[in-house]
Amino acid sequence: MGLFEFLKKKEPPKPAAGPRPMLRPMGGGLPPHPEPKAENNFIIAILDSCRFDSFMTAAPKTMMKLGPVEKRYTYASWTAPSHYNLLTGLLPHTSPPNVYASEYYKEDFFNYNSRLGTKGIEFGKMVPTLWFPGLLRNTLGYSTHARVSLPVLNPKTGINRDFDSFTLMDHHNDMRAMLPTMKFDTARPSFYMLNIGETHYPYAKPNEDSSMWPRISGVNGVFKKMDEAVGPDGQLIKDQTQFFDHEKLEQLRARQIDAVRYLDDVFQELFDLVPKNTHIVITADHGELFGEMGYFGHGPIMHEKCFEVPYLEGKIR
């Protein structure tokens, strides 16, 4: 049984339907919020590219106030598909042996009842969209928001659906700038997805001089420069940049660890900001390679370190 079959409820046969209703045009207004059916605000804080052992080496004291840290595994090896997957409601998994995927999905979804502070969530209403922000907003009455650091997740992409606000931050590495934009309404719970870029290459804190960073493009940058990468003869012009040596790779690994330690102070500010009934998940969208088996980064890589991520959740008060 796949995810779609699990969520879909079997119903008795219905009489033949009339003409299909016109769908709401893309980019049109969202429907009104229903009355809220949950008590907890819910935040998913995604440390982009943060591999599990980097997090554990950093030993962030503030973040660990949420609860024990688990090693989990992401469903994808790079940012865009991993965030799409997170927004279906599937969090990084534990890779349990001798368990059917359908049984794992059921338990994962059932746990949202306690995360959101409600009972009997009607997951069947996620069919056919399979979109968790839609369930949160249009069934449970949440206000839904996203703050993203990486341009590959910008508001023009397909994941900007059923969000009341969706903002690409001015800088890719400044979680602290997200905090003043986060508002919590006493009339209804809020959902925030935070894509946090300090742990993404080049693992930079916001006060660093960007002119000193080496430049390696992600998918967004590749698209921007693709026309320049094709010569007049129609052949692809390959970049001759030399691969990082061991010393540089170790420096980059240390930078990611340092970024986690820096973010720990910012998370204290987040914890001070959120209201009492706020359930927070801290995790990553994928891991990162620092020279293992000749790999660097993430994306077209099949290696366990590209999928191992930290996972912790709970209420701060």
Language-model segments: residues:
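Catalytic domains that recognize anionic headgroups
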Residues: 1-317
